[in-house]
């Protein structure tokens, strides 16, 4: 089901840096696979912030896969993160199969860039809340909800990677406790 031949990796509980599977510095691409549209987001080269890129329309042909592969090249992506929609009861359905099939097809096109499947539970709900908080009316959300969901998927992954990566000795730190006020 999950092929390693094309560097398709399934990581249900976040990054496993012990196996050194994570690429170095560079942009990441986040993908929210839907039945009609695919939301796309990308990160800055340092992997700190996810930003929406575009919504790619799905086609019966491979036209959408071609566009996703083009984005990997255009944006010089070092890793692709595809949301895998699990249910709250840890089950998968047709949406998950669709995400897996899309990720496998994309992995074949962009090898050796790794394509990872990551848990995307409740990302659309989170994206809707973020858009509502930003003042986007419900009727206007449809045009950007897929991109917003891709941002949530990618940002969650970036945050997990940062949390799993020990601080390097050459990185400057404040030496302060989180939440502590620092005088300039």
From Swiss-Prot:
This is Putative pre-16S rRNA nuclease. GO terms for biological process: rRNA 5'-end processing. It comes from Mycobacterium leprae (strain TN). Disulfide bonds: none annotated. Keywords: Cytoplasm, Hydrolase, Nuclease, Ribosome biogenesis. It is found in: Cytoplasm. CDD domains: YqgF. The lineage of its organism: Bacteria, Bacillati, Actinomycetota, Actinomycetes, Mycobacteriales. GO terms for cellular component: cytosol. InterPro entries: RNaseH-like_sf (IPR012337), YqgF (IPR005227), YqgF/RNaseH-like_dom (IPR006641), YqgF/RNaseH-like_dom_sf (IPR037027). SUPFAM superfamilies: Ribonuclease H-like (SSF53098). The keyword Lipid metabolism does not apply. Pfam families: RuvX. Belongs to the YqgF nuclease family. Residues 1-23 are annotated as: Disordered. It comes from the Bacteria. Its EC number is 3.1.-.-.
């Amino acid at each position: 089901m999950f092929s390693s031949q094309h560097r398709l990796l399934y990581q249900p509980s976040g990054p496993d840096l012990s196996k050194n599977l994570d690429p170095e510095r560079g942009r990441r691409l986040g993908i929210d696979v839907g039945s009609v549209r695919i939301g796309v987001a990308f990160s800055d080269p340092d992997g700190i912030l996810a930003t929406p890129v575009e919504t790619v329309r799905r086609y019966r042909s491979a036209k959408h896969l071609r566009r996703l592969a083009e984005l990997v090249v255009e944006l010089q992506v070092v890793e692709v993160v595809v949301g895998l929609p699990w249910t709250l009861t840890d089950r998968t359905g047709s949406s998950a199969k669709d995400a897996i099939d899309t990720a496998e097809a994309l992995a074949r096109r962009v090898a050796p860039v790794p394509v990872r499947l990551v848990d995307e539970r409740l990302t659309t709900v989170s994206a809707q809340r973020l858009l509502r908080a930003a003042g986007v009316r419900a009727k206007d959300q449809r045009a950007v909800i897929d991109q917003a969901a891709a941002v949530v998927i990618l940002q969650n992954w970036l945050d997990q990677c940062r949390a799993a990566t020990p601080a390097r000795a050459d990185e400057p730190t404040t030496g302060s406790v989180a939440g502590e006020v620092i005088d300039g």
